[in-house]
Amino acid sequence: MDKVTGKAYVLGDNVDTDQIIPAEYLSYNPSIASERKLFGRFALSGVPGDQAGLPEGGKPFVDLADENRTASEFAVVVAGSNFGCGSSREHAPLALAEAGVRAVVATSYARIFFRNSVNGGYVIPAESEEKLVSEIRTGDQVEIDFDNCRLRNLTTSKEYPLRPLGDVAEIIEAGGLFAYARSRKIA
């Protein structure tokens, strides 16, 4: 699997799907390209300001002041436990992907968010063995090596172990559950 490299955006525990993509933006239609991009524009806009972009807080994920901006500068979200809790909302991992996020690294996930991420092929949900929110700062350059189960903070040169993706790795590499089924001639 390819490595993911880019800037990290750090959040705390219990980031729910309403914070990832607030309900007022669910009226956009993801099958219309111009509306699909708006999911990226409003990704993580529901996170309270003091919890956005840790450790300092107050760092917006997407600069909403720029009306033409639909993506973020961050390729990796680093979070604490229970990431993606709340309602079952397939739009949550879609919004992160549309914002340019390629992977989320969290201590644990709400299972429905994890499955929506894998099944839709939106973002790679990696699990850290230790809580990285106190080790990585928003803006740090990180590299995730899925084959060797490591996250390297390129800013500090520290490395951290990740749990293996296991059976879902093949689904992720295929681009989601439907693509995986087609490649296996299941569907």
Language model features with spans:
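Catalytic or ion-coupling anion/metal-binding cores of large enzyme and transporter domains
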Residues: M1-R41, L154-Y160, P164-G166, A179
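Feature captures the catalytic cores and cofactor-binding loops of soluble hydro-lyases/lyases
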Residues: V10, Q19-I21, L26-N148
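Conserved phosphate/anionic-ligand binding catalytic regions in large, soluble enzymes, centered on
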Residues: V15-D16, G84-H91, I172-A181
